[in-house]
Amino acid sequence: MAGSPLLCGPRAGGVGLLVLLLLGLLRLPPTLSARPVKEPRSLSAASAPLAETSTPLRLRRAVPRGEAAGAVQELARALAHLLEAERQERARAEAQEAEDQQARVLAQLLRAWGSPRASDPPLAPDDDPDAPAAQLARALLRARLDPAALAAQLVPAPAPAAALRPRPPVYDDGPTGPDVEDAADETPDVDPELLRYLLGRILTGSSEPEAAPAPRRLRRAVDQDLGPEVPPENVLGALLRVKRLENSSPQAPARRLLPP
């Protein structure tokens, strides 16, 4: 309480007066604290008047004590209110001081960020409140930005290790586009009869080429290739087998006898 602004500022008179009133009410009046002096009374005096005068005296003592207790409670509430106001004023002053400190730190950071190079002549510190650095510092304070976060934004962060790794080379697979697809579609089709013939050879597993009949297209190719020269013996044998297959009639299917 010694360094309180309420005791040293313009409110010191009101607080001092409340403290004095509180001390005065806590101290009992001398009429209540002094012991009453017993007056000598005669033996012939009656005891009834004494009983009548004792009751108002007891009431008079009880009434000031109740008023004093109520006044003490009022003063205690007023003193608590003043102490709460003092605490709020102190917290407000501390917040203002912290805001001023942040403003000074931001101004120094901005001044260091925009400082000229070593070759340039040094400039005098700018304390103008309308300077760009001060205006930016006030704007940042209004936005409640952290000075540490601002410093982290001003200093460039190191590049991650993943960005420094070399990328694999990109190989050119040739031109792509609709023209290439059209060119791929122009490939010659395979004869389905030849495919069926080859598939039958693979499934039967026969090693002799004469085991299965050749397709008609192959027979025509053999007939067209025959010229005035004498064909070899294996070609003549193949032609004879083909002719026998063409002349032979298909066998009738056997009839199944049904039971009577």
Curated annotation (Swiss-Prot):
Pfam families reported for this sequence: ProSAAS
Biological role: May function in the control of the neuroendocrine secretory pathway. Proposed be a specific endogenous inhibitor of PCSK1. ProSAAS and Big PEN-LEN, both containing the C-terminal inhibitory domain, but not the processed peptides reduce PCSK1 activity in the endoplasmic reticulum and Golgi. It reduces the activity of the 87 kDa form but not the autocatalytically derived 65 kDa form of PCSK1. Subsequent processing of proSAAS may eliminate the inhibition. Slows down convertase-mediated processing of proopiomelanocortin and proenkephalin.
Segments of this protein annotated with the region ProSAAS(1-180): 34-215
PTM info: Proteolytically cleaved in the Golgi. Big SAAS, Little SAAS, PEN and Big LEN are the major processed peptides in proSAAS-overexpressing PC-12 phaeochromocytoma cells (lacking PCSK1 and PCSK2 endopeptidases). Peptides corresponding to PEN and a proSAAS aa 40-59 have been detected in wild-type PC-12 cells.
Lineage: Eukaryota, Metazoa, Chordata, Craniata, Vertebrata
Region annotation (C-terminal inhibitory domain) ranges: 221-260
One term under GO cellular component: extracellular space
GO biological process: neuropeptide signaling pathway; peptide hormone processing; response to cold; response to dietary excess
Protein name listed in UniProt: ProSAAS
InterPro entries, per database record: ProSAAS (IPR010832)
Principal localisation: secreted
Tissue: Expressed in adult brain (all major structural regions), adrenal gland (medulla) and spinal cord (dorsal and ventral horn). Expressed in pancreatic islands.
Coiled coil: none
PANTHER family the UniProt entry points to: PROSAAS (PTHR15531:SF0)
Domain of life, source organism: Eukaryota
Gene: Pcsk1n
